[in-house]
Amino acid sequence: MKFVDEATIKVDAGDGGNGVVSFWREKFVAKGGPDGGDGGDGGDVYLEADENLNTLIDYRFNRFYNAERGKNGSGGNCTGKRGEDITLKVPVGTRAIDIDTGEKVAELMTHGMKQMVAKGGWHGLGNTRFKSSVNRAPRQKTLGTKGEVRELRLELLLLADVGMLGLPNAGKSTFIRAVSAAKPKVADYPFTTLIPSLGVVRARGNKSFVVADIPGLIEGAADGAGLGVRFLKHLERCRVLLHVIDILPIDGSDPVQNALTIIDELEQYSEKVASKPRWLLFNKTDLLLEEEADEKINEILEALAWEDRYFKIAAVSRTGTQELCDELADFMDTLPKEIQTEEEKAANKVDFMWDDYHKDAMSGKDVVTEDDWDDWDDEEDDGHVIYVRD
């Protein structure tokens, strides 16, 4: 199945049903009190994570989704039926962004997780709600509110522990083939990898982690060159980044400049991603003598002023790959789990437009008055007497 990690959809929550103006009518009761019922709430729209899905391709062909409208109220204090909700299944790791506001509406990280993305409209109030000691025959009602309408951008972010980045043909796909059972395409031309791929790596002590391989970056990727930076989003949830550097590029380019290009593109994309722990992987060391490879690596480290961890590997022959994986597994055990701060929670809170609707309705806003009850006269309503035969 084709891998699709981004789709745009439009969701319409159901409108609320209207309240109704009605009065109690039956034999021998000519002027009963108000009995207009409320409308029903509109249906909501939800996203639910499903571990059996791994692509958003279904939402490329069907972009519009509507929840059911609430039914109107009726006489006899009958409340209208609530509209049916609609639930859209998406892969685990999907997030939803409101295109108009840019806010993150939902982020689904575990199987079965369910979040609302569009709230149904509130029900309208029937005239029974407006009766009082001074208004015994209210002709007021309120209409149901419109349901939320949102245009959402669905983004599928791979859930991986380790993310790989580098220029095309740096050896990222060869590395993931060497350390896992994943088999991404490998060839001697740029952009062999067109979509991200995942591999499960086994390390010592029965430890394991997931590594993600994304298409290569080139200079100007932040401005759309090559495949752009659209796949960098898959690194946002990674805990460690592996920056693969080809110490002997086939095109004769400078490894130092190549490394700086990747760092620059990463920083332009996101400071948060750029600040993640990042290790350098010097690949294709088997193409040079050991002394020459060490000399080349030291030159690169000095030019980058690099003081963090780095490893020398030859992915095609799997030289140094197992030691690297063991070190990665041990290092990730020392990393703290990400905990969302109160500020981040507040920033991610979604404010819906209908939160204060009922308060506004009862205060007199959006009240509709029906004047078609001319046969009713408040002045004449002094109660009525029911005669009961003994």
UniProtKB/Swiss-Prot annotation:
Its EC number is 3.6.5.-. The keyword GTP-binding applies. GO terms for cellular component: cytoplasm. Keywords: Cytoplasm, GTP-binding, Hydrolase, Magnesium, Metal-binding, Nucleotide-binding. Residues 1-159 form the Obg domain. The keyword GTP-binding applies. GO terms for biological process: ribosome biogenesis. It is found in: Cytoplasm. Pfam families: GTP1_OBG (PF01018), MMR_HSR1 (PF01926). GO terms for molecular function: GTP binding; GTPase activity; magnesium ion binding. Residues 160-333 form the OBG-type G domain. GTP binds at residues 166-173, 191-195, 213-216, 283-286, 314-316. Coiled coil: none annotated. Mg(2+) binds at S173, T193. Transmembrane segments: none annotated. Monomer. PANTHER family: DEVELOPMENTALLY REGULATED GTP-BINDING PROTEIN-RELATED, MITOCHONDRIAL RIBOSOME-ASSOCIATED GTPASE 2. Belongs to the TRAFAC class OBG-HflX-like GTPase superfamily. OBG GTPase family. An essential GTPase which binds GTP, GDP and possibly (p)ppGpp with moderate affinity, with high nucleotide exchange rates and a fairly low GTP hydrolysis rate. Plays a role in control of the cell cycle, stress response, ribosome biogenesis and in those bacteria that undergo differentiation, in morphogenesis control. NCBIfam families: Obg_CgtA (TIGR02729), PRK12297.1 (NF008955), PRK12299.1 (NF008956). This is GTPase Obg.
